[in-house]
Amino acid sequence: MMNAETALLLSRQSTDDSFREYHCSAGLIFLAFAVEAMFIFYRRQVDSDYDKRGDKACRKDFHKKTLELYGIKNYLGRRDYQIVKTCLDARDSIAHGDFFISNFEFTPTVADDHNIFSGEILTQSSEQFRNITLRMLEEGINAAKRIDEYIYDNGYKVDENIDSEFMPKLQLAFGVSGMYTW
């Protein structure tokens, strides 16, 4: 999540459109990684035997099952999840090499130099990158943090024979520094 937030700050500071677009795209990719890691982190808190490599479930089913394991039902339709899903889908369109046809206006600046034409055309963003905006990244980061907090506030290990109010709290995914005190 820290990389996504850094990319957000860099894109806000950028005065050049291509740098802003680059940082937004990089931030969105890191956001998607963070969200996937968050769900795996929570899954392992309630299912210590969970093996990511052996899990062939699609993302939607994995997220739904993981949420159900800590007592949260019908969350995938909520606004925050839908915002994050949009970010995940955008990342997938980049990462999986989805085919896009991009149209844009092009007026040659020099009459005879084909090399310059090529450079100008190749610097145009393809469709999947044009759809990534600063707002999309910012909303995605905020939505992911709210999902993390919601799971932390409302989630518990369902299979224990203890009332939910007395269940031990799950650890925040985005609040973990990577260090653990023994």
Where are the regions that the model predicts?
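Short, hydrophobic, well-ordered secondary-structure elements
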Residues: 21-44
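A generic secondary-structure boundary signal that marks alpha-helix termini
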Residues: 13, 36, 43-44, 149, ...
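Charge-enriched, short contiguous segments at helix-coil
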Residues: 74-86, 90-171, 181-182
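Short regulatory "switch" loops immediately downstream of catalytic or recognition motifs
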Residues: 7-13, 45-48, 98-107
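Short non-catalytic regulatory patches outside canonical folded cores
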Residues: 36-89, 96-97
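Amphipathic, well-ordered alpha-helical segments in soluble domains
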Residues: 3-10, 30, 37, 90, ...
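Charged alpha-helical initiation segments
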Residues: 1-24, 168-182
